[in-house]
Design a protein with these regions (language model features):
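Outer-membrane beta-barrel domain signature, strongest for Gram-negative TonB-dependent receptors
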Residues: 213, 219-401, 407-409, 624-626
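Solvent-exposed loop segments that connect transmembrane elements
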Residues: 206-215, 252-300, 344-374, 416-449, ...
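Structural signature of Gram-negative outer-membrane beta-barrels, strongest in the C-terminal barrel
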Residues: 229-231, 390-393, 405-407, 450-633, ...
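Acidic, small-polar-rich N-terminal luminal/periplasmic segments of exported/outer-membrane proteins
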Residues: 33-162, 613
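C-terminal beta-signal and adjacent terminal beta-strands/loops
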Residues: 677, 761-769, 790-846
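Membrane-embedded beta-barrel scaffold of Gram-negative outer-membrane proteins
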Residues: 317-322, 326-332, 337-342, 571-587, ...
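Outer-membrane beta-barrel translocator/receptor signature
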Residues: 105-106, 118, 127-136, 141-224, ...
Length: 846
């Protein structure tokens, strides 16, 4: 993206908003005052301008005005927030780099104050949402779970005291349609209900498959919610909330629109990407990858799938007004099973084929090779939590909250790579004996799994004291304890020229070995044919053989920490709020299970010392400017790194690094109502986030450190690879610059009002991994959204027309390379942003 294009876009937005402002006096009648927004960022109702933390908030109405429907939309419109469509949110450079079992999120999501382990809740239709709040910086002295980066609070609508309802319908391009319904009101005196549902469809995928399989990113989703709320006497209110989600999509977790934008590797005999456990399915293939010319085109013979089933959420909250204090109990339970799978070879090639190859034992022909490779991934999670907190509810100078918290999570995560239609893979041999090994009916050449049980406990509290009318102080403290137990499993079945080579060492002729598959698990992990080889290595003495094939080990760890916050706030007048705050954040350590039995799976805990100074200022009720300057010392940053498990097979696994980093930056948010009917808004974020300690590691995708951006250190290793330094690399998911500009213009008519709006966003380039190579870089991108809303005078009807990504810019959320292929290039996998979408939404309230 060139500077010229960025400047041109900024100029166009500036001219457009100026033109709107100039035309306003003759057309709009409403007052030039900004609406006050009340938030619960500190667990009590406060004006957004009075809260001494950096917060961005959206009401349900503002989400409709800006077109914020997904977590991607939230991230794009909010400063210092980034999202990659792997269900990972990052704030100020603090984000989760892997979904591997045994790891925790860096940003906590709360739905009505109850923690959720998935970002899927953030895509709940706005009809069911009262308000969405994004808190930046460590949180912990007010909330149940820890978060080093920040928190995403979603406050849902509660049952109404008077009967009301709303129905919505949306139609758009790509065969999009959506229907939402919500009804709420009293049942009897002191008893209220809410019930509603949503059906969302996108019959045509964003990514056009010119092959025989279906398009990618088609959507079929359902949601149902029911609540009942009761007054238990004059001072107690209890509510039960149940929600069910169901997805049947043609793409993976977190809205993954994925494409490989490099040529097929037609020359390598084995391997796919950086795997070398099976023959390369595109070896000798004559086809051309259409994604090179157009990343929204693929040519595959297998349809991607993403299914969310049995996703149920149960919440219960009880609030008891004790007079000078409020006692609250929160219980939450959530479960889901998520499955995704798709075409791993990314080609349309069908039918088994032969590969002619040379080995140290002469030429041979690998026969009956299946090109149908699939990836598969599953999450099976259940978690529940209990929280009791007691807080002040008076208007005195002292405000306080204290609470206790318990959390349990149970999780399994089977995943891997398989080949379809290969009898040899389904019936492997034992490496040590040559006799049949346990069956491999799914044809998995890589199968890893893990189980996890987490028990967490916390005690927290915070006080805010007004020294006088202008000055107040804040102090908070938290103690956390996390106990984790689990298992880690892997099985490797190989049918490659490596298989033939190793079998030949045992006297098996190449002509025989080329048609066999072998359970190579002990060889890949431990370097020998039997479990005894593993037990001879202290790092693998806890491994055990599994009767169904493969190896397994137990993992366990405990972590605890004290964290807290200190702050001072100065409010010389009702329109000024200046604050200085220190917060210490903690994220428990863990491990990388379901990642290949790496020898060092554990990671230490993360800590963040965050220093922040902020100013929130309002002028005349028509102009607001909120700024925050932060400096964060990031200790123990958990970074996953792919390592080679076995030099002979080339198999890899992932282990954790604990690195040091430094994040500092500036955030500015502003709103201005210069004339009746006109509102201009914008935000800017600058983040300098770099690794300060981290050496020395081999990039398995550039083992000799020859690619651009490599930082080799020391002499080459015996196998020819080179270590690299990570110092100076930017933290992943952290654009240095991010700009959001927009404006709304409302014209009042006798029958209603018409609002025209536009939003422009510039997001700087981002790194996907911890190495500094440009191959891990997602280029900067720009996005323009346009909307028009008509609302009748009685506020019963609303019609919204929208265009998202109006310029149809192709942008990536992440970019990941493979090792160098036989073509001398690498396989580049990108995750795409949404293309241009157009639609109309109808709303009716009764």
């Amino acid at each position: 993206m060139t500077n010229t294009l960025r400047l041109r876009s900024l100029f166009i937005m500036g001219v457009s908003t100026a033109a709107i402002a100039a035309a306003t006096p003759a057309l709009a009648q409403q007052a030039t005052m900004l609406e006050e927004l009340v938030v619960t960022a500190e667990r009590r109702d406060q004006s957004l301008q009075d809260v001494p933390v950096a917060v961005t908030a959206y009401t349900s109405e503002r989400r409709d005005l800006l077109g914020i429907a997904t977590v991607e939309d939230l991230a794009r419109n909010s400063p210092s927030v980034a999202y990659t469509n792997n269900d990972r949110l990052s704030i100020r450079g603090f984000g989760r780099l892997t979904n591997a079992i045994g790891t925790d999120p860096s940003v906590a999501l709360y739905s009505d104050g109850i923690f959720s382990n998935s970002m899927a809740d953030s895509s709940t239709p706005s009809l069911f949402i009262e308000r969405t709040e994004i808190l930046r910086g460590p949180q912990g002295t007010l909330y149940g779970r820890n978060s080093v980066g920040g928190a995403l609070n979603i406050i849902g609508k509660r049952p109404a005291y008077e009967f009301e309802g709303e129905v919505r319908a949306t139609v758009g391009n790509y065969g999009t349609w959506q229907s939402d319904l919500l009804v709420s009101g009293p049942i009897t005196e002191g008893l209220r209900f809410l019930v509603g549902g949503s059906v969302q469809r996108r019959d045509e995928g964003f990514i056009d498959n010119i092959g025989p399989a279906g398009d990618t990113s088609a959507v079929k989703r359902y949601m149902f919610e029911a609540q009942i709320e009761a007054d238990l006497g004059e001072n107690i209110v209890a509510r039960l909330r149940y929600t069910k989600f169901d997805w049947d999509d043609s793409y993976g977790v977190g809205n993954v629109h994925e494409a490989v934008i490099t040529p097929y590797d037609t020359t390598s005999i084995t391997g796919l990407g950086n795997s070398a456990l099976y023959y390369n399915p595109t070896s000798g293939f004559a086809g051309v990858n259409p994604s090179i010319a157009d990343p929204f085109k693929i040519n595959t013979n297998q349809t991607n799938e993403g299914k969310l089933s049995d996703h149920q959420r149960l919440h219960f909250d009880l609030t008891w007004d004790l007079g000078g204090a409020t006692l609250k109990y929160l219980f939450g339970r959530q479960q889901y099973v998520y499955n995704t799978n798709g075409d791993e070879d990314r080609s349309v090639r069908t039918g088994n084929f032969n590969i002619a190859a040379a080995t140290p034992f002469g030429a041979y022909t690998a026969t009956n090779i299946s090109p149908n490779q699939r990836f598969f991934y599953e999450e099976d999670q259940t978690w529940y939590s209990n929280e009791i907190n007691l807080s002040s509810n008076s208007d005195g100078p002292l405000q306080w909250i204290t609470g206790i918290y318990q959390y349990n999570q149970q999780y399994s995560q089977p995943q891997g790579l398989r080949v379809l239609g290969d009898p040899a893979m389904q019936n492997p041999l034992n490496l040590a004996t040559g006799t049949p090994a346990p069956l491999n009916p799914d044809g998995n050449y890589l199968f890893v799994d893990g189980s996890l049980n987490v028990d967490s406990y916390a005690v927290f509290g915070q006080i805010d004291y007004d020294l006088n009318e202008q000055w107040s102080v804040t102090a908070g403290l938290r103690w956390s304890k996390d106990e984790k137990t689990g298992t880690d499993f892997a099985r490797y079945v190989s049918r490659t020229n490596t298989t033939t080579t190793v079998l030949a060492l045992g006297g098996i002729p190449a002509a025989v070995g080329q048609g066999l598959a072998v359970d190579f698990t002990t060889f890949v992990v431990c370097g020998g044919p039997t479990i005894a080889t593993c037990h001879a290595n202290p790092l693998y003495r806890n491994l055990r053989a599994v009767s169904t094939g493969g190896l397994e080990r137990d993992l366990s760890a405990e972590y605890d920490a004290f964290t807290g916050t200190l702050g001072v706030q100065w409010s010389p007048d009702v329109d000024t709020n200046a604050y200085l705050r220190y917060s210490r954040g903690y994220k428990s350590g863990g491990w990388l299970a379901s990642n290949g039995l790496t020898p060092f799976p554990y990671a230490d805990a993360e800590y963040v010392d965050n220093y922040e100074v902020g100013l929130k200022k309002t002028w005349g009720g028509a102009f607001q400017l909120n700024t925050a300057l932060f400096y964060a010392d990031y200790q123990g940053f958990q970074a996953p790194l792919t390592v080679v498990l076995n030099q002979t097979t080339g198999s890899t696994g992932t282990q954790f690094l604990n690195l040091e980093a430094l994040n500092w930056g500036l955030e500015v948010e502003g709103q201005w109502a210069p004339l009746p009917g006109v509102q201009l808004f914008g935000s800017y974020a600058y983040i300098n986030a770099e690794i300060t300690e981290g050496c020395c590691y081999v990039d398995t995708n550039d083992p000799r450190a020859l690619q651009a951006g490599a930082r080799p250190v020391g002499a080459p290793l015996p196998n020819g690879s080179r270590n690299q330094s990570l110092v100076g690399s930017r933290l992943p998911m952290t654009p240095e610059h991010k700009v959001n500009l927009g404006g709304n213009y409302t014209i009042d008519f006798t029958p209603g009002s018409l609002t025209l709006g536009a939003t422009y966003t510039y997001t700087g380039d981002m790194q996907t991994g911890v190495f500094g190579s440009p191959r891990y870089t997602s280029p900067s991108n720009e996005n323009v959204d346009l909307r028009a809303l008509w609302k009748d005078a009685e506020d019963r009807f609303t019609i919204i027309g929208y265009v998202k990504n109006a310029t149809d810019e192709v942008a990536y959320q992440s970019s990941t390379p493979s090792a160098v292929t036989g073509l001398g290039t690498f396989r580049q996998t990108v995750k795409l942003n949404f293309p241009r979408t157009v639609g109309v939404e109808f709303q009716y309230r009764f």
